[in-house]
UniProtKB/Swiss-Prot annotation:
The protein's name: SAGA complex subunit Sgf29
Gene Ontology biological process terms in this record: positive regulation of DNA-templated transcription; regulation of transcription by RNA polymerase II; transcription initiation-coupled chromatin remodeling
Family: Belongs to the SGF29 family.
Native organism taxonomy: Eukaryota, Fungi, Dikarya, Ascomycota, Taphrinomycotina
Domain SGF29 C-terminal: 109-244
Chain segments carrying region Histone H3K4me3 binding: 222-225
InterPro entries registered for this protein in UniProt: SGF29, SGF29_tudor-like_dom, Tudor_SGF29_rpt1, Tudor_SGF29_rpt2
Pfam families from the UniProt entry: SGF29_Tudor (PF07039)
An MF annotation (GO) of this entry: methylated histone binding
Keyword Transcription regulation: yes
Keyword field: Cytoplasm, Nucleus, Transcription, Transcription regulation
Amino acid sequence: MVRPINAEEDVTSMWVKFHESLNPIRSSLIKQEECYKTVDGDDNPIEERIKACDAGIQTSEEQKKELEHTMQSLEMIINVLEKANEKPVITNSPLTRSRRNRGTSFTANTVTFTPGMSVAFKLPYTRHNEGGDWIQCIIIKVTGEGAKQRFEVQDPEPDDDGNAGQIYKTTANHLIQIPAKGTPLPPISPKTNVLARYPETTTFYRAEVIRTLPDGSCKLRFEGEEEVGKETVVERHLVLEYNG
């Protein structure tokens, strides 16, 4: 029995339970495949094929119920994340010089990072990773205050086995807020260096702004683009001003 999601839980627990809810669906798909093979087998007795057909129908009905529960859980998670992104808490303190050198988000004020907020996260340096890459993550936990404040962020993309995305521990210096889609944002001047999410990925790369389009999106030239002179259009809220 999959544990139901409670709206008062933290995002981590909600994601874990959501992935657990996918297991019965995977099992039912395997059962359906077995039923299909039996029904499709011309050499199988007719009684066995009819029995497999009935079992397949029953499995489909069970799968429908599981999918309904899963969709409800996913909608609850989305609602929590949307609320967190729609109402960020912002203080009036200006960024310190050291923080500004590391990177700034769409506002000149210090952002108060909260659970559920979407952020660009700078991957740490490890033996297997040279570091410096930025990926889209979700803040799932905040501890401490002031200089001792720490964050846990999670990659929203599940791994190849369908498990929940990796969780990282970090500080505010390695985070940039990603504004919610539809947030009014000022245009960015041509030739400005930015971090932007490359289309169809969750990774942010350095780019140069060519111009802002009438719909507010930005036409960019990404650093290291294989196709020489290629220009790419990216939605404005996924283009982050960055001086790093």
